[in-house]
Amino acid sequence: GAHCVIANAVIGAGAVIHPFTHIDGESLGVTVGEAALVGPFARLRPGAHLGAEVHIGNFVEVKNSTLAKGAKANHLAYLGDATVGERVNYGAGSITANYDGANKHRTVIEDDVHVGSNCVLVAPISLGAGGTVGGGSTLTKDTPAGALTVARGRQVSIPNWNRPKKLPKA
């Protein structure tokens, strides 16, 4: 695509790199598999390895991660230090929280997992095959295969609530 930066990368046959995508493998390299779709406005950092038919959409960043065949992260997401299985759907706004302030940790997402929108996966963590993560969840523990995992507070509505008023300037 137009206005792309592509360096230190291997792009597979039939892969499409949409405009304004930034791919730079530096010393670790980047691999984009056959028939993969990347961008627009995606960023593939060193160690990003995309399998065949992977979709990395707009404003998705991938660093030091492997995505297996057919995995999708279509928009507004971060995958760092992750191993992602086949046919995973990674929801908009979801991130891997891979850095604890001192060390980097890995996230493993097994085959056929669906991660809802706006999830935080706090590494080290492993999501079992075929599982579903409810949107808005922050996960800190491994999840079993085939399970629906939801980790968020229940919605509460407070009737007749008044917003604080602005104080007059002194």
Where are these predicted regions, by residue range?
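Terminal amphipathic helices with adjacent charged low-complexity linkers/tails
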Residues: 1-20, 39
